[in-house]
Amino acid sequence: MDIVSTRRLVRSEWFLAVSIATSLAFLLFGDALKADSADATVQAVVFIWLFLAILWSAMCVVRHAEHLAERLGEPLGTLILTLAVTAIEAASISAVMVHSRDQPTVMRDTIFAVIMIILNGMVGTSLLVGAWRHREQSYNLQGANIYLSVVVPLAVMSLIMPNYTHTTPGPTLSFYQQEFLGVMCIGLYAAFLAVQTGRHRGYFALEGEEDGHGHELSGGAAAPGASAWQHALLLLAYMIPVVYLAEQFGEPIDHMIRRLHAPAALGGVIIAALVATPEGIGAVRSALANKLQRSVNICLGSLLATIALTIPLMIVVAHLMGATIFLGLEGTSYVMLLLTLAVSVLTFGSGRTNVLQGAVHLILFIAYVLLIFQG
């Protein structure tokens, strides 16, 4: 790489310096910045600072993972992308679990929030803006059905079934039930990858569009002239501070919830928003560009990967920590999950979308947000 290309690369990756500087600041002064006795204004600034630093760094991680996916092909490309996003989410959930041992619902709340944000927020926005600009849009019905055929049983087995087991008290699973759930998640995701990248690759593309694995890049422009190994190094360079900062984010989330007397489920929403936003931006851009197939792949693909990979990983973390995790949803959350899954099956049952379908999903997302505070 020549000097000009190097300068362009440095300019395009300016946020890496911000991310590293933020990590050093919390490494050196983290205890003071996150102290429970700190002024409310200081705590608010720390919370916003960390949230924005993690969010933008995560967008950069996703961007470089997407470039690697394009260069390395499948299934390695898909695995890199999903593992990068899952690592960020797992670090965030683990941090909250460590600092809030009296909140055993954080994993459940985060998984549920991811489902609501993606299936209602991201899908609703993508369908609405896409149909508003292009009236009706098409996608491959078989691919959408395959996504949902895996998402629905994983969501039901992990978030509803624990309410009806009798081996342990409360909305929990026994050790062997948790192990089965983890193995089932990994097994179904492996089978899905085999279908997506091999035997039925065409189900995830629409005639006239490029291969359905593509993602709309987010987090800034691509590093100019960067090779695969440079994208790999930059991905690792961003991943180290973003995982560290995600671990530091546990205390500010806990402080914010206690200071505002907010519901504990809000912590899961914040973590889910960090994970879903980078790909959500790509999904909306794709819908606006009349590439709904790509948007569907981004939304449903990221949801499936999040559920299938985060649950087994967090089960292992909970065992290592000796922590109890509540999985079963209760009350209005239970109803919202069933309603969202049912509406999603109807939405992705025709191969074409319109404004009304997007509006319905967005209304469900607004209802979800309302019920967090008024449930």
Whereabouts are the PLM-identified features?
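Hydrophobic alpha-helical segments, chiefly the membrane-spanning helices
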Residues: M1-G375
